[in-house]
Amino acid sequence: MGNCLHTAELSPSTENSSQLDFEDAWNSSYDVNYSFPDVDYDANLEAAAPCHSCNLLDDSALPFFILTSVLGILASSTVLFILFRPLFRWQLCPGWPVLAQLAVGSALFSIVVPILAPGLGSTHSSALCSLGYCVWYGSAFAQALLLGCHASLGHRLGAGQVPGLTLGLTVGIWGVAALLTLPVTLASGASGGLCTPIHSTELKALQATHTVACLAIFVLLPLGLFGAKGLKKALGMGPGPWMNILWAWFIFWWPHGVVLGLDFLVRSKLLLLSTCLAQQALDLLLNLAEALAILHCVATPLILALFYHQATRTLLPSLPLPEGWSSHLDTLGSKS
């Protein structure tokens, strides 16, 4: 960490002017009575020397972005191939449409990671950056909402369970996710060759809306699922939301939602940081939370594969074998 914002150097004209002013004040020091103005020692942090931590996700982090993108695309493609291969038995995973959409969301995120990566210089444009943030957060919002529906509806999402339910949820979830990305899409662009959200007074309403959306989807949604699970279990009202390994997805986005909310409070001066160390710590947490969120595109396919393995191990013994397999096993049994 350190101070990465450098103060502007004085121009020669400014230095000469300052020197003349100092000499005039020195020569007249015996004839003038000075009155010292009151000094406001409680000025806010931004009025003091720059007090921000170095950005961890700068140009040097470009290999991290590229490697994560490649691994995420390969892993998501593998999961999609498994789910859509011709011999796949759909009854092994009643909620396979949700799993497929989670893999698609992870793949979309992986594709746009290089677009928002630093170090690409002049290749960034405002339109491309806005599109990147739209897909970046849209895929994440959709995945979170899909996980919430999967936990709440469980096996009712299987094919043939409730006609039209899966299609309706798919259209609704991705539509809501697209609407939630409008604020960050409109409040982002290219600045200094980097894709970044634009913080300005004119866009404060959009920034607030985006922050609220992140808090609701990444923070409050998993907390609500956990709360409903515990409440139903305590009151004996049934099992509650279906808890499984897929909930591990929120580990990668929950910190991002929390730190983004804190950063908005600080920028809005609703939360004042009293020391430089606190501001530097917040900057560091922002970078770490963003890096953790980026890693979800690699972890999500692995989580899906583990969930599929658990589902097949649980349901396979109870499923009837195909007709050809059963006759073949009967033949082997008679020979023995």
UniProtKB/Swiss-Prot annotation:
The keyword Disulfide bond applies. It is a multi-pass membrane protein. One of its GO terms (cellular component) is membrane. Residues 1-63, 117-129, 188-207, 266-287 are extracellular. Its main location: other. InterPro entries: Duffy_chemokine_rcpt (IPR005384). Keywords: Disulfide bond, Endosome, G-protein coupled receptor, Glycoprotein, Membrane, Receptor, Transducer, Transmembrane, Transmembrane helix. Residues 85-95, 154-166, 229-244, 309-336 are cytoplasmic. Glycans are attached at residues 16, 27, 33. One of its GO terms (molecular function) is C-C chemokine binding. This is Atypical chemokine receptor 1. The lineage of its organism: Eukaryota, Metazoa, Chordata, Craniata, Vertebrata.
